[in-house]
């Protein structure tokens, strides 16, 4: 297929790059992880002809990348398919790099802001708190946008900083970009707590390990785990945030 090229030269760093040169307005990429989880992305029409970046967040093994063009209504036709054998350099790789949902470059406003906040931080945990408070203080929840947002929405951290408003996904994307830009492995996780749709941010702190759900969105409000609990990473503190573990399901990690 001449319209599609896939760059698999960075799979050890936990991402692939795909370029679509066609003219169809709705194109979807499905990435199937080694455990069978299917991630569906909508390509950004503004990026046709250049590469977009997508995470490989399902650990080592064989991934499948399938590209579909919209034919009519909600029907899609497969135009490109490739399998990839992935061996990550380490478990942190997919959570350190930019991707379609957490985009930044060295010139991004988010990276410059991250550097400034980092310079004022005592350590990584302090920096996580600085990021949380910066975003909560400077971004206002956009209720109208939340009610009208279309599926396939792609957040843009710099645009969120410029507008000062955003929906849940915008907050999560900006926080994740700020954290990753300062080399803190960060998972943007989406899933369910009981019936409710949730977003979480989990970070890896060198002194502690992975701290799950250090920042959480419950569908209404953002909250930050008590830093002293985060530092000890005690099971009871995590339980307090997610309730009974059996009700808590991470569906996707970006």
Write out the residue ranges for each language-model feature:
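Generic detector of short, locally flexible boundary/turn motifs and exposed helical patches
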Residues: 30-32, 151-154, 164-170
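N-terminal start-of-chain detector that recognizes signal peptides
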Residues: 2-3, 37, 158-159, 171-176
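Short N-terminal helix-initiation segments at or just after the protein's N-terminus
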Residues: 6-8, 144-149, 168-169
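Hydrophobic/aromatic-rich core segments of domains that either
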Residues: 170-254
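N-terminal accessory/pre-domain segments preceding catalytic cores
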Residues: 1-123, 211, 245-254
């Amino acid at each position: 297929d001449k319209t599609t090229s896939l760059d698999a030269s960075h799979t050890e760093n936990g991402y692939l790059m795909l370029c679509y040169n066609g003219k169809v307005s709705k194109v979807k990429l499905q990435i199937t992880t080694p455990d069978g989880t299917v991630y569906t992305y909508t390509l950004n029409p503004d990026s046709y002809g250049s590469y977009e970046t997508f995470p490989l967040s399902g650990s080592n093994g064989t991934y499948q990348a399938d590209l579909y063009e919209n034919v009519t209504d909600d029907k899609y036709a497969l135009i490109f398919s490739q399998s990839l054998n992935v061996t990550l350099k380490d478990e942190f790789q997919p959570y350190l790099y930019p991707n379609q949902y957490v985009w930044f470059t060295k010139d991004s406003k988010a990276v410059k802001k991250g550097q400034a906040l980092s310079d004022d931080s005592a350590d990584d945990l302090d920096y996580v708190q600085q990021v949380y408070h910066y975003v909560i203080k400077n971004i206002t929840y956009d209720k109208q946008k939340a009610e009208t947002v279309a599926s396939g929405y792609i957040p843009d951290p710099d645009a969120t900083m410029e507008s000062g408003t955003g929906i849940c996904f915008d907050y999560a994307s900006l926080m994740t970009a700020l954290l990753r830009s300062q080399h803190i492995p960060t998972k943007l996780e989406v899933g369910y707590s009981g019936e409710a749709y949730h977003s979480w941010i989990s970070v890896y702190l060198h002194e502690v390990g992975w701290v799950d759900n250090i920042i959480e969105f419950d569908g209404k409000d953002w909250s930050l785990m008590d830093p002293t609990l985060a530092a000890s990473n005690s099971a009871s503190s995590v339980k307090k945030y997610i309730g009974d573990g059996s009700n808590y399901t991470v569906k996707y990690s970006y």
